């Protein structure tokens, strides 16, 4: 039986700011963009959460909920540096590490000799070492499988840990709300609820063929998770699935012509980012994303095995047709990446200056 630890730093960006600027301690604090520039909250501390402030909320709304909110810009270089320190602690206990972001990771400690092989004691030791090294607290989940370890890390926050032993899995998943399963978002949860499926026990009792028919491959995954099954090994060399760039606009725009003024710069930046992080990867789709003035968003995508500049313009037109008169506050473009490498003879936009004269 495997021993998986999921480490999740507590309100990471905000915690770094409170550490570096002690005057922020005890005050509601958020890291994000300025409200007068239509910024969005990246992370907030627990004091801010008491007022209803949440990640991905507009800074304007956050300040409405909490007028005394201290809003600071992010310092990504600092967050990356501290993240490297945190990962150095992980490496003392295992070399099987799957980073998920700057502030969370899976660790497989099945064969680790530390703490007499106890995953619970290792999680505690890791959290203590992180605090000694960085002054930041972390929470941990311990379980035999990945998705339960991730769920468990959220059950005793902040600065705590939670263990799900193998024999507890059937009882634990029985009443587990489906929305708690990684990969089940609000839209999927609503579709499941429409079928009368609210928790894992509901899925266990639902006809498998109907679930697979309704959700395809994800239906198979959902059935596994509902039965406490997750055979996935840790992915130590996680390949990016996509590369994208987006911009939040200072003022809402409404016309296709206005969008066309912004799109070339986004495409150029997309090419630059791909050159840095996905130079040898083959693309398999192009995507345009719009977020409207009511904060609802839409995405349009199309299969493509090489970058087609004109396709972004076509997708933008299709997306804008869904605006129903609403203003556009955010515009983004991205490409989906396959696991395959680019053929050396295939046309590529990576690293090149794009000719955007259409």
Curated annotation (Swiss-Prot):
Record keywords: Cytoplasm, DNA damage, DNA repair, DNA replication, DNA-binding, DNA-directed DNA polymerase, Magnesium, Metal-binding, Mutator protein, Nucleotidyltransferase, Transferase
Residues the record marks as site: Substrate discrimination: 13
GO molecular function: damaged DNA binding; DNA-directed DNA polymerase activity; magnesium ion binding
Active-site residues, Swiss-Prot/TrEMBL: 104
One Gene Ontology CC term in the entry: cytosol
Record EC number: 2.7.7.7
Cofactor(s) of this protein: Mg(2+)
Swiss-Prot/TrEMBL GO biological process terms: DNA-templated DNA replication; error-prone translesion synthesis; SOS response
First-listed, main subcellular location of the protein, grouped into a coarse class: cytoplasm
Superkingdom assignment: Bacteria
Residue ranges of every copy of the UmuC domain listed in the record: 4-185
The record's free-text note on cofactor binding: Binds 2 magnesium ions per subunit.
Subcellular locations according to the entry: Cytoplasm
Pfam families found in the cross-reference section: IMS (PF00817), IMS_C (PF11799), IMS_HHH_1 (PF21999)
Known function: Poorly processive, error-prone DNA polymerase involved in untargeted mutagenesis. Copies undamaged DNA at stalled replication forks, which arise in vivo from mismatched or misaligned primer ends. These misaligned primers can be extended by PolIV. Exhibits no 3'-5' exonuclease (proofreading) activity. May be involved in translesional synthesis, in conjunction with the beta clamp from PolIII.
Known partners and oligomeric status: Monomer.
Record-stated family: Belongs to the DNA polymerase type-Y family.
Protein name (Swiss-Prot/TrEMBL): DNA polymerase IV
Organism: Shewanella denitrificans (strain OS217 / ATCC BAA-1090 / DSM 15013)
């Amino acid at each position: 039986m495997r021993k998986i630890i999921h480490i999740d730093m507590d309100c990471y960006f905000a915690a770094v700011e409170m550490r570096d600027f002690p005057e922020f301690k005890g005050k509601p604090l958020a890291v994000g963009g300025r409200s007068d520039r239509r910024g969005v909250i990246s992370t907030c501390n627990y004091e801010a959460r008491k007022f209803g402030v949440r990640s991905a909320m507009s800074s304007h709304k956050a300040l409405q909920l909490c007028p005394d909110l201290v809003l600071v810009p992010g310092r990504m270089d600092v967050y990356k540096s501290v993240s490297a320190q945190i990962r150095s602690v992980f490496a003392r206990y295992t070399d099987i590490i799957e980073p998920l972001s700057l502030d969370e990771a899976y660790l497989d400690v099945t064969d680790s000799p530390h703490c007499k092989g106890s995953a619970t004691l290792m999680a505690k030791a890791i959290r203590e070492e992180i605090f000694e090294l960085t002054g930041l607290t972390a929470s941990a989940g311990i379980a035999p499988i990945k998705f339960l370890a991730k769920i468990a890390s959220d059950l005793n926050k902040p600065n705590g840990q939670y263990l799900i032993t193998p024999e507890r899995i059937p009882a634990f998943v029985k009443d587990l709300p489906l929305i708690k399963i990684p990969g089940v978002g609000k839209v999927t949860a609503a579709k499941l609820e429409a079928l009368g499926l609210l928790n894992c026990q509901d899925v266990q009792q639902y006809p498998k063929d109907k679930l697979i028919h309704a959700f395809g491959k994800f239906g198979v995954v959902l059935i596994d998770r509902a039965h406490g099954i997750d055979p996935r090994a840790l992915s130590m060399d996680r390949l990016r699935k996509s590369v994208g760039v987006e911009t939040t606009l200072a003022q809402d725009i409404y016309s296709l012509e206005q969008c066309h003024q912004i799109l070339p710069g986004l495409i150029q930046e997309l090419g630059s980012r791909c050159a840095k992080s996905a130079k040898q990867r083959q693309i398999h789709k192009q995507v345009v994303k719009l977020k409207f003035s009511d904060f609802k968003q839409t995405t349009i995508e199309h299969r493509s095995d090489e970058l087609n500049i004109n396709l972004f313009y076509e997708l933008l037109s299709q997306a804008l047709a869904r605006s129903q008169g609403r203003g556009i506050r955010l515009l983004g473009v991205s490409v989906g990446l396959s696991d395959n490498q680019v053929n050396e003879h295939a046309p590529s936009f990576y690293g090149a200056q794009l000719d955007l004269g259409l």
